[in-house]
Amino acid sequence: IKLSKKSKIFIYGTGVLKSWNINIVGNKDEVEDNFRQDSNLLTGCVTFFGIEIYDIEISSINNMCEDAINLLNVKGFIRDINIINSHFDGLDIDFSNLEIQNINIENSGNDCLDISSSILEIDTFYSNNCVDKSLSIGEKSTVKITTFESLQSNIAVAVKDSSNVTISNKLGIENDMLSLIHI
């Protein structure tokens, strides 16, 4: 799916979204100052809302919204998420309960992964060149990550608001400032 200026995708409904491969391509030259949220207060170039998903793959390249991908009140299993060149946050997960096999995020203008009020199990998380945080966890979230790698970000992991994170294997944590902060 090719997104043009001011276009967004909103995926919602009953039932299960199963075995889909979703590829979103934006235009990094079409940044608009007031595009951080739309008239429905949606912040994602692609927003999944209130659905169950199983065995899907999502990729996003050159998307300029507040969140390249936003998972809001979603449950299920995601095989792969790949995000390259997001103007602000790469992936925003709110109020969700998910198992994710692989997350790869590169070149985010803010946080690579922002998690709020969610329960997540992530097998492999890799990020490179996140301007702010590689991984931000807040609002009573519980996150388990088997393998974590963060390169060239300001902060590798920030945990706040009574949230918990467990990281089993830490590989290649090379960032500008802090490796782990807890607020």
Task: Identify the meaning behind each predicted range.
Residues I1-H182:
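Extracellular beta-rich repeat passengers
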